[in-house]
């Protein structure tokens, strides 16, 4: 089983342990930049917030930087999962990490979608590889508790260019901490863009530049 598939299954099946009703999945690339409390994640009524937005910041970045594939893939993937749930309308994103999930949403997906089709979560991932979208669309479909929308908890840099432009425009940890709980620097920046692979020397220079920028974050 591919590592990415097994990782999706482990994160999404954690709820079965019965340890908690809600849990936060934090990637190793994520760093908290200010203190946080339960109220950052759980509404006064006791329900977890739901990350839901339309990824307009990312899509605009892709347009400005000639990354048409990013935009095309985003909309194509949402259309695929929306078709599974027989939903039309806006193309929502329910991430990026860290992800706040509820056992009640996963249980609803299991009881109302997977079991009636004699499926498990591995089958779901084979059908559509994206646990974040499975969770979000299940939340929209089954509503086991009121949906209280929030923006992502962390400033997420999908691409190195985003990080560098942010630095050039004066982004600081202190400034980001006013709106975000943390930041996430992708460890696979070099493999995510649809640009041609650059020569080794160019990549080495970029790595050195990245280290220098990180030193002052």
Locations of regions flagged by a protein language model:
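Conserved donor-nucleotide/metal-binding helix-loop-beta segment in metal-dependent transferases, i.e.
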Residues: 31-67
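Catalytic core and acceptor-binding pocket of nucleotide-sugar-dependent glycosyltransferases
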Residues: 79-171
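Short His-Asn-centered micro-motif
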Residues: 6, 26-28, 150
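Active-site-proximal specificity loops/subdomain of glycosyltransferases
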Residues: 1-17
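Short, solvent-exposed loop/turn segments at secondary-structure junctions
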Residues: 29-33, 37-39, 55-57, 140-142, ...
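Short aromatic/hydrophobic "clamp" motif used to bind/position activated sugar donors
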Residues: 23
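Membrane-proximal basic amphipathic "stem/tether" segments
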Residues: 80, 86-88, 178-217
């Amino acid at each position: 089983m591919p590592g990415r598939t097994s990782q999706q299954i482990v994160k999404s099946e954690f709820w079965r342990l019965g340890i908690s009703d809600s849990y936060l999945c934090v990637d190793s690339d994520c760093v908290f930049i200010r203190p946080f409390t339960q109220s950052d994640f759980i509404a006064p009524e006791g329900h977890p917030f739901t990350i839901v937005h339309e990824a307009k910041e990312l899509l605009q970045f892709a347009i400005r930087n000639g990354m048409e594939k990013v935009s095309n893939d985003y909309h194509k993937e949402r259309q695929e999962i929306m078709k599974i749930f027989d939903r039309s309308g806006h193309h929502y994103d329910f991430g990026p990490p860290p992800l706040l999930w509820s056992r009640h949403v996963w249980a609803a997906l299991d009881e109302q979608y997977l079991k009636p089709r004699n499926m498990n979560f591995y089958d779901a991932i084979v059908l559509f590889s994206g646990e974040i979208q499975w969770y979000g669309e299940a939340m929209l479909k089954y509503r086991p508790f009121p949906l209280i929308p929030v923006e992502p908890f962390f400033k997420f840099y999908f691409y190195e260019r985003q990080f560098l432009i942010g630095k050039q425009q004066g982004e600081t940890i202190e400034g980001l901490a006013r709106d975000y709980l943390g930041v996430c620097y992708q460890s696979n920046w070099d493999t995510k863009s649809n640009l041609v692979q650059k020569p080794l020397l160019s990549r080495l220079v970029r790595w050195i530049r990245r280290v220098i920028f990180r030193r002052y974050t």
